[in-house]
Regions:
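Proteolytic maturation boundary segments
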Residues: 135-162
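A short, acidic, amphipathic alpha-helical segment used as a generic capping/interface helix at domain edges
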Residues: 121-133
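A conserved active-site cap/scaffold subdomain adjacent to cofactor or substrate pockets
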Residues: 1-11
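Residues within well-ordered alpha-helical secondary structure of globular protein domains
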Residues: 1, 58, 79-82, 132, ...
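M16 family metallopeptidases and their MPP-like homologs
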Residues: 12-121, 136-145
Length: 162
C-alpha cells in the first residue's frame, strides 16, 4: 500500500501521475518462510522504460532509507485492516489465509491477532525490512518485456544494488 497498490502509493504518484512514465504501476509481495517475492508491475511505452526503471529504483531506495511517513503507515494500516476483515466474509479467502499462516507461522492466527500485530508495526520496522531486502546479495532482479527492457532492467538493478 505504501510503495504500490493504490492511487496514493509512491510509485503511482511519481511514475504515473507526476512524470507520466507508466499507464499502470503496482507493487506486491508474497512472503514465505525462508524466502519471498516483492514484485513490481509497470506498463509503459518502450521509450520510457529506462527512465521508469530509474524512478522506480529511486522510490524503493528512498522508502528503505527514510521509511514511510506516519501518514503513509496509518493509511496502509487502515487499508490492510479493512482487507483482513473483508476477507473473513469469503470462505475461499479465509481458508487460503489460514493455510498460509500455518505454512509461515506454524499455526493459524485470528483476525484480531493479525490486526493487533499490524497496529504494532512502526516506521522504523518498515525501514529495517526495506534495508534488509535491499542488502547486497539478498535480491535478484528479473525484467520481462521486449529486448529493450533488458537495458532498463540493468539500470534498475544497478540503481538499487550498485
Amino acid at each position: 500500500e505504501i510503495l504500490g497498490g493504490g492511487m496514493a502509493s509512491r510509485l503511482f504518484q511519481s511514475a504515473r501521475e507526476r512524470l507520466g512514465l507508466a499507464y499502470a504501476i503496482d507493487a506486491w509481495s508474497e512472503p514465505g518462510e525462508d524466502a519471498g517475492v516483492v514484485g513490481i508491475y509497470a506498463g509503459s511505452a518502450a521509450d520510457r522504460a529506462e527512465r521508469l526503471a530509474e524512478v522506480t529504483a529511486l522510490e524503493i531506495a528512498d522508502l528503505a532509507e527514510t521509511g514511510p511517513t506516519d501518514a503513509e503507515l496509518s493509511r496502509a494500516k487502515a487499508v490492510l485492516k479493512a482487507s483482513l476483515w473483508m476477507a473473513d466474509e469469503s470462505l475461499t479467502s479465509r481458508s487460503g489465509r489460514l493455510a498460509a499462516q500455518v505454512l509461515i507461522h506454524g499455526a493459524p492466527r485470528s483476525t484480531e491477532d493479525q490486526v493487533a500485530a499490524l497496529e504494532a508495526v512502526t516506521v522504523s520496522e518498515v525501514r529495517a525490512v526495506g534495508r534488509r531486502i535491499l542488502a547486497p546479495g539478498r535480491s535478484a532482479t528479473a525484467v520481462l518485456g521486449p529486448r529493450a527492457a533488458g537495458k532498463a532492467g540493468r539500470k534498475f538493478h544497478e540503481a538499487l544494488f550498485g
